[in-house]
Amino acid sequence: MAYPFQLGLQDATSPIMEELLHFHDHTLMIVFLISSLVLYIISLMLTTKLTHTSTMDAQEVETVWTILPAIILILIALPSLRILYMMDEINNPSLTVKTMGHQWYWSYEYTDYEDLNFDSYMIPTQELKPGELRLLEVDNRVVLPMEMTVRMLISSEDVLHSWAVPSLGLKTDAIPGRLNQTTLMAMRPGLYYGQCSEICGSNHSFMPIVLEMVPLSYFETWSAVMV
């Protein structure tokens, strides 16, 4: 979850988010090494008079500064492509939930159940209970089973929206007339918050997302009550 004044990324709750965190650290280390090398060279240029002003040709140096960046780009591209393919892969989902974006709320439909659907609106600040988060709580949470693959079908009724939950590494555009899909799997129970991540009008900041990941037995009880 997120914490006040947090500087880093949220804790990973899904295998995809764990991979994204590892890739972030991998890329950041490469950027740090390159930046350190550049700063070292600049400091040498500023503190020494040993400059090669008469050098006209240096094929060895040109070869190094051509091949080395290519190798670095490959080291960044290969894990990135692997994660992209993992995010697009859908393996026998146990449950499908259709999500529709509206100005300015979300509606959800559990397609595996005959009549299980609801709208999800943000709870106004004056109606919050002690311990609830401002601008992030909703009147109807999306309850899903943990440790199971869930497919989300995402679209929009009016303008562009984006369905995003950072702890799960999810961000999928909701486009009118187009059905996008993504998968999620939470490794532990809890409440996971997100928000619309595409500017969609005056109340864009007031359409949060709340996922409640629970054990399968609790989900079956909840779905039986809702239906």
Swiss-Prot record:
Its annotated function is as follows:
Component of the cytochrome c oxidase, the last enzyme in the mitochondrial electron transport chain which drives oxidative phosphorylation. The respiratory chain contains 3 multisubunit complexes succinate dehydrogenase (complex II, CII), ubiquinol-cytochrome c oxidoreductase (cytochrome b-c1 complex, complex III, CIII) and cytochrome c oxidase (complex IV, CIV), that cooperate to transfer electrons derived from NADH and succinate to molecular oxygen, creating an electrochemical gradient over the inner membrane that drives transmembrane transport and the ATP synthase.
In terms of InterPro entries, this protein maps to: CcO_II (IPR045187), CcO_II-like_C (IPR002429), CcO_II_C (IPR034210), Copper_CuA (IPR001505), Cupredoxin (IPR008972), Cyt_c_oxidase_su2 (IPR014222), Cyt_c_oxidase_su2_TM_dom (IPR011759), Cyt_c_oxidase_su2_TM_sf (IPR036257)
The organism named in the record is Lycalopex griseus
* Residues that hold Cu cation A2 according to the record: 196, 198, 200, 204
**This chain belongs to which protein, by name?**
Cytochrome c oxidase subunit 2
Which loops or segments lie on the Mitochondrial intermembrane side of the membrane, by the record?
1-14, 88-227
Question: What ranges are annotated Mitochondrial matrix (topological domains)?
Answer: 46-59
The UniProt keywords, alphabetically, are: Copper, Electron transport, Magnesium, Membrane, Metal-binding, Mitochondrion, Mitochondrion inner membrane, Phosphoprotein, Respiratory chain, Translocase, Transmembrane, Transmembrane helix, Transport
Keyword hit for Lyase = no
Molecular function terms, GO-annotated: copper ion binding; cytochrome-c oxidase activity
Q: Which positions in this protein are listed as binding Cu cation A1? A: 161, 196, 200, 207
> Where is the PTM Phosphotyrosine found along the chain?
218
What Pfam families does the database record attribute to this sequence? COX2, COX2_TM
Cofactor binding annotation: Binds a dinuclear copper A center per subunit.
Residues reported in the UniProt entry to bind Mg(2+): 198
Q: How does it sit in the membrane?
A: Multi-pass membrane protein
User: In which compartments does the protein localize?
Assistant: Mitochondrion inner membrane
